[in-house]
């Protein structure tokens, strides 16, 4: 009898979860504040990482930027400083124009910290994380964004590049999370964001290493989310970001069928980041961009494999990475010829 009652209770909770999800979809929750909170972003020197940094800066977060390229990372930091200066000017203007009765925002007094770190190396992650704790303080939001792509067919890809892809795209999430999650657990306060890819939900030919790394991120993130829930740490949130192809140049040359491409073009980086920010600031567990990716993932799960192959061929998705791989190979050959290799 006890298990029967529990079954009905679970059924009610499942249905209630659907109601809450529908309510959040219809009535968007208010964005939470990250003002003054320490937000660490990996791969902040370019692409989505840079755009995430600028978005969090506009929301007055205290930023810690990691990248393997110190020059590009510093360029992002200077953009962040410009935003901070603009915010400080706005605060000063408000104080000057406000009456005594009006509440005035305090001065920003925000700083951005840059660290050169190779997230593909465990020792580099742990040593840099220790510096962050010592020089900045506790990290509230960890955004794992750093990623690489080899751009080779499996049988032509050097083993070292496969290992590098797995280390940077997947293993780094383990190292950074192990470095910063303990304090979040202690305080029951934090947020972990994993930037994966639609290629972590379904795959295509020619990017076996990249797909494996992103599938790994999705599995890691889902298991981590369950572990946090099992620990009853309801103050720690997680968000999984799975965008479709983003027009950052990382997959330049990738093409689906030309008749279909106008309906499913590469995502603009700004749009992708704004959608992800909306999910992060409302504690949404997962965001796929565009929403069509939810349907594709569901269909891939229920359709026979041959049916999926048929759909891929119709969309031109079966060999969509081949032009990208050819361009990367040509660029490599040109570079070797230029350097006399």
Curated annotation (Swiss-Prot):
Membrane topology, record value: Single-pass membrane protein
Coiled-coil stretches: none
Binding site for NADP(+): 40-64
EC number, UniProt record: 1.1.1.300
Entries under InterPro entries matching the protein: NAD(P)-bd_dom_sf, Sc_DH/Rdtase_CS, SDR_fam
Top-level EC class as recorded in UniProt: oxidoreductase
Residues reported in the UniProt entry to bind substrate: 197
Active site residues per record: 210 (proton acceptor)
Family matches, as Pfam families: adh_short
GO cellular component terms, semicolon-separated: endoplasmic reticulum membrane; lipid droplet
Catalysed reactions listed for this entry: all-trans-retinol + NADP(+) = all-trans-retinal + NADPH + H(+)
Any one GO MF annotation of this record: all-trans-retinol dehydrogenase (NADP+) activity
Subcellular localization: Microsome membrane; Endoplasmic reticulum membrane
Keyword Transmembrane carried by entry: yes
SUPFAM superfamilies: NAD(P)-binding Rossmann-fold domains
The protein's annotated pathway: Cofactor metabolism; retinol metabolism
Main location: membrane
Transmembrane segments: 3-23
Alphabetical keyword list: Endoplasmic reticulum, Membrane, Microsome, NADP, Oxidoreductase, Signal-anchor, Transmembrane, Transmembrane helix
Function as written in the Swiss-Prot or TrEMBL entry: Retinol dehydrogenase with a clear preference for NADP. Converts all-trans-retinol to all-trans-retinal. Has no detectable activity towards 11-cis-retinol, 9-cis-retinol and 13-cis-retinol.
Similarity remark: Belongs to the short-chain dehydrogenases/reductases (SDR) family.
UniProt-recorded name of the protein: Retinol dehydrogenase 10-A
Taxonomic lineage from the root: Eukaryota, Metazoa, Chordata, Craniata, Vertebrata
Gene: rdh10-a
